[in-house]
Design a protein with these regions (language model features):
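Sequence-level preference for short, compositionally simple segments enriched
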Residues: 1-330, 337-346, 353-388
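Right-handed parallel beta-helix/beta-solenoid
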Residues: 1-17, 389-419
């Protein structure tokens, strides 16, 4: 997709709409600011899958300026969100997804309804309600930045944030506002639990919480419980002085049943374990036993739904290009069977997205070409410089992927670009 007309489409939504039933569309998006209110599927979508790959997360931006604040009460979260994900098994990489409304009330940037979504190396930016999850869905976020001020990760479902940056904007507020868990756990069934009931929901592991300049000490809470049967948990996370000593805020009595947990929180200033002696009485410090037994995405995703969600396998992607052959007029390479396409760079800049395993060039062309593989789910490998490539062994994967009738190596690749 490219707004300047150099791609197959100028709008992301048009590229999504072009994906046929029974296939996955891998949509490559060139840098630009796309103000579209994008829908990756609808409630009726059952057999279409989407991967959105941005060229660079800092410059490839899906944006919205719509809010549900004063004067806009008729708007819904769907109207506000720059991206609404209804299709299952959605994948996004190298994108900024934002709402620029500011401190005017609810204004989502991202809403996910489809199950088994993955966001890799993305930025979610807003003020209030930046990211809205949904009960019944599982999601995995890795190496992402999520920023906001009020309840900016909220609602139900089973969402896991690994090695992410959680950024607190100037002012004060709450990181999370969890709602219905959808999977209550009891000590009878899960004996390592430290409480009689546990409501898993929003999990943050190995995340770093940072604060903007001017945020006062103690101005933020880890969260507040929107509903009673809800949960949020911070595992091995670095916390700044901006986090209030109480950790968690009460909300109309919901806190007495909610599962608001921490495990080995770290003081970002010292690198030592954080002082949790003044934490709210309704919150919990998890035990080693329950964290080891239950508090990991593999276990919880499998318990939440029977349908497999192997996020680790998906994120491994395809093998990087290998076994390059360079002649005066052509560069060719190999990958494994999990590669759906390739991104070619010329002197470090994007040149094209292709399903071919070769590039024709002029004999006098002395540019440096590098190639990255794109997996069937849309995961981009490290780019390999053709002139420096070493011969390495490919390890094909058995994972299936529907082929598109017009050709290519599995799936339909749609190039999307912008200014």
């Amino acid at each position: 997709v490219a707004q300047d007309g150099t791609g197959d489409y100028t709008k992301i939504q048009d590229a999504i709409n072009a994906i046929p039933e029974g296939s996955r569309g891998i949509i490559y998006i060139r840098p630009g600011v796309y103000e579209e209110n994008v829908y990756a599927g609808r409630k009726s979508t059952k057999n279409k899958y989407f991967s959105l790959i941005g060229e660079d997360k800092q410059t490839t931006i899906l944006t919205s300026g719509v809010s549900r604040g004063k004067g806009n009460e008729d708007n819904t979260y769907n109207d506000c969100a720059a991206l609404n994900v209804y299709a299952s098994r959605f994948y996004a990489e190298n994108l900024t997804i934002r709402n620029t409304s500011g401190n005017v009330g609810q204004a989502e940037a991202l809403f996910t309804n489809g199950d088994a979504h993955i966001f890799n190396n993305c930025i979610l930016s807003g003020y209030q309600d930046t990211y809205k999850a949904n009960v019944g869905a599982r999601g995995y976020f890795t190496n992402c930045t999520i920023e906001g001020a009020t309840d900016f990760v909220y609602d139900g479902g089973m969402e896991w944030f690994d090695s992410c940056r959680i950024h607190l904007l100037k002012g004060g507020g709450y990181i999370t506002a969890p709602a219905e868990s959808g999977m209550p756990m009891t000590k009878v069934m899960y004996p390592e639990l430290s409480a009689d009931k546990f409501y898993p929901g929003l999990f943050f592991r190995n995340c770093t919480v940072t604060a903007a300049d001017g945020v006062a000490d103690g101005a933020y809470y880890l969260g507040r419980p929107w509903k009673e049967t809800c949960g949020a948990m911070f595992i091995d996370c670095k916390l700044p002085k901006a986090i209030n000593a109480k950790g968690w805020k009460d909300w109309s009595g919901s806190e007495n049943k909610a599962s608001l947990y921490e495990y080995k929180s770290i003081d970002a200033a010292t690198g030592s374990l954080a002082d949790v002696s003044s934490r709210a009485s309704f919150s919990h410090q998890a035990t080693d036993a329950e964290v080891e037994a239950y508090m990991n995405p593999k276990f919880l995703f499998a318990k939440y739904k029977d349908e497999p969600f192997d996020y680790e396998k998906i994120l491994r992607g395809a093998a990087a290009p290998m076994n390059f052959v360079v002649t005066p007029n052509e560069i060719s390479w190999e990958s494994d069977d999990n590669a759906a396409g390739y991104i070619i760079y010329k002197d470090g800049a994007f040149l094209r997205f292709t399903t071919d395993r070769s590039l024709t060039k002029d004999a006098a062309d002395d540019a440096r070409y590098s190639v990255a593989s794109v997996s069937r789910k849309g995961v981009v490998s490290k780019a390999v410089l053709a002139s420096d490539a070493l011969r390495i062994t490919a390890f094909p994967t058995a994972e299936g992927f529907g082929k598109y009738a017009t050709g290519g190596r599995g799936g339909r690749v749609v190039k999307v670009t912008s200014l």
